[in-house]
Regions:
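Structured inter-helical modules in multipass membrane proteins
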Residues: 31-141
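Cytosolic juxtamembrane regulatory segments of multi-pass membrane proteins
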Residues: 29-43, 209-220
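Juxtamembrane membrane-water interface segments immediately C-terminal to a transmembrane helix
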Residues: 14-25
Length: 220
């Protein structure tokens, strides 16, 4: 059945979305750890003897993350995503980059490289998530599925009539209802999986602010 291919496609997209969202969150957490634990004013790279307020710096990155995930939630949860929200997300990602630059003098070269890699993973994960939101199962396949569901009763009508004549009216009606019910359920499953971010289906991805990025989850 075409609907089976649609379900498989939608399910694969959901699994990919989970993978990319996990990378996005994990990279964000790694950057937060770096801002909390890697800063060393006595680093050999700090040749100018610069100073930094660690608590103020961590509070800033926490505020950026809160705004970033709130805007990401707004974008992904919308039926029609707002391009302005996307622009704000990109700006906030830029603020994360600027925060990384502020601690660059206090990190050794290898740590700076790892920090930039985590930011790159965030950017790549973000774009993959947004592409999954905006580009879904091919329209031709979804349209074919809808056509199949609509013409199914017409095509199989004689079959159900034959069963009703041969086995009894009640049995024929029961088989027709069963077939239609199964296809309707499969179609609903496909619709629920199609957009894993809309919050409609029970299997949708939760987009609330990750508790692992909260200030109370990590101690200095």
């Amino acid at each position: 059945f075409p609907i089976v291919f649609s379900i498989n496609s939608a399910y694969s997209r959901r699994e990919k979305a989970l993978e990319h969202y996990s990378v996005f969150k994990g990279s964000a957490l790694s950057i937060r750890y770096a801002h909390m634990h890697w800063i060393d004013e006595n680093s050999k790279e700090n040749r100018r003897g610069l100073k930094i307020n660690g608590d103020e710096h961590v509070n800033r990155i926490d505020t950026i993350y809160k705004n970033l995930f709130n805007n990401l939630y707004e974008y992904l949860h919308a039926v029609k995503p707002n391009p302005e929200t996307y622009d704000r997300i990109i700006e906030l990602l830029g603020e994360v980059s600027l925060s990384n630059e502020k601690i660059r003098p206090f990190l050794i070269d290898t740590e700076n490289s790892r920090l930039q890699n985590n930011l790159r993973f965030m950017a790549i994960g973000l774009e993959k998530i947004i592409n999954i939101k905006n580009y879904r199962t091919p329209n031709s396949l979804r349209a074919y599925t809808k056509v199949f569901l609509n013409i199914f009763p017409i095509i199989f009508g004689p079959f159900f009539a034959h069963i009703a004549t041969d086995k009894g009216m009640e049995f024929g009606i029961a088989i027709a209802i069963l077939y239609s019910l199964v296809l309707t359920i499969l179609d609903n499953i496909q619709e629920d999986l199609e957009d894993p971010f809309d919050g409609v289906g029970t299997d949708d991805i939760r987009l609330n602010f990750p508790t692992m990025l909260g200030p109370s989850t990590v101690e200095d």
